[in-house]
UniProtKB/Swiss-Prot annotation:
Homohexamer. This is Uridylate kinase. It is found in: Cytoplasm. It comes from Dechloromonas aromatica (strain RCB). It catalyses: UMP + ATP = UDP + ADP. NCBIfam families: pyrH_bact.
Length: 238
């Protein structure tokens, strides 16, 4: 078995990843499979922070399209991420992993608030820390929250788990001639306006010299291969 290249990682999971083949919500088989992929990495001693999206329940931008106030819609989206974080924490429990949920919004009867020092202590104790409610502020995506939390906890890399196996020159579902990048610089990704992550997240990671790897969470063993430094997905570098 290969040794892990990274000691501490920040994993960004989209809410849509939890849906599986369903149109909405959380698919039990899918979340169990994702936990299995994460457990394989945790069992190697890697410290794992997770930022979870909420698009399987509510997406702020979708709310604004119907005339909803943007800040209100974004706060609703943040609450959706807390629901996903709780579901993920329980799924970890069922597969034998110890996890803690921290929320950027105060919901203390349900989950504990985000406290950086406590999060780092949990990681050092071998617990998985799931960060809910994004940054706690409207107008910022959960991708930006992943860049922020990754920087705060001293992660060595941000791993963005998606439905596709990397960053493409165009949407591979719409353009059959689209090609996948093995590596791409932050500046090139920003200048090409590649939609896999927003520019704010790219810029923050670039400024902190925090690399990003974009890969498919549905490709068995892909997460472990990325953590072990094998060629998987697309690496975004400084």
């Amino acid at each position: 078995m290969s040794a892990p290249k990274y000691k501490r990682i920040l994993l960004k999971l989209s809410g849509e990843a939890l849906m599986g083949s369903d149109a909405y919500g959380i698919n039990p088989q899918t979340i169990a499979a994702i936990c299995g992929e994460i457990k394989a990495v945790a069992d190697m001693g890697v410290e794992i922070g997770v930022v979870i999206g909420g698009g399987n329940i509510f997406r702020g931008m979708a709310g604004t399209a119907t005339g909803m106030d943007r800040a209100t819609a974004d706060y609703m989206g943040m609450l959706a991420t807390v629901m996903n974080a709780m579901a993920l924490s329980d799924a970890f429990r069922q597969c034998g992993l110890n996890a803690r949920v921290q929320s950027a919004l105060n919901i203390e009867q349900v989950v504990e608030p985000y406290i950086r020092g406590k999060a780092i202590r949990y990681l050092e104790e071998g617990k998985i820390v799931i960060f809910g409610a994004g940054t706690g502020n409207p107008f910022f995506t959960t991708d930006t929250a992943a860049a922020l939390r990754g920087s705060e906890i001293g992660a060595e890399i941000v791993l963005k788990a998606t439905k596709v196996d990397g960053i493409y020159s165009a949407d591979p579902k719409k353009d059959p001639s689209a090609t996948r990048y093995d590596k791409i610089s932050f500046n090139e990704a920003i200048s090409k306006n590649l939609a896999v992550m927003d520019a704010t997240a790219f810029a923050l990671c670039r400024d902190q010299k925090l690399p990003i790897n974009v890969f498919s969470i549905f490709k068995t063993g892909a997460l472990k291969r990325v953590v072990c430094g094998e060629d998987e997905g697309t690496l975004v570098y400084c």
